[in-house]
Amino acid sequence: MTVTRLLLGSTLALTLGSCAMMAPTMSYTLAKQPAGGALSSSGMVDVKKDGMTVMTTARVMGLAPNTYYVAHYHLQGAASADPCSSGGAPIMNSALVGQSDATGMLTLTGSVAAADVMNATYFNIHTARDATGAPADAGVTCTGIKM
């Protein structure tokens, strides 16, 4: 009986421990930024912490067709209390690069070490100069986030 209780207790601890590792997916709504100009971008960013990794999926529509974009997390800047207007430093190892389709839709998916983005306060999508992902503007769409 003691062995059974020990095994059940160990199983319960492992089960609960694995639940603590995975947080629910948080969804954030992207908002158009001044650099977006004539674009009518809208979309969502889903952020999921899984142990020591943060997985990100961004789905955006209303972008320029067949154009490269780069997205990444940013730290809070000092220019404004609003994260997307704060001018914070980009966290470059969180960069996701992709090309919109012929209708202006874009999906970006990737992961980064959780420790690298734990202090991020916003997620910004920029037009990219080319497939290398060098930003060409201050950002066309953005959302504040909480890690």
Q: Which positions does each model-derived feature cover?
A:
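Bacterial N-terminal signal peptides that target proteins for export
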Residues: 1-8
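N-terminal leader/targeting pre-sequences
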Residues: 19-147
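Bacterial N-terminal signal peptides
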Residues: 9-18
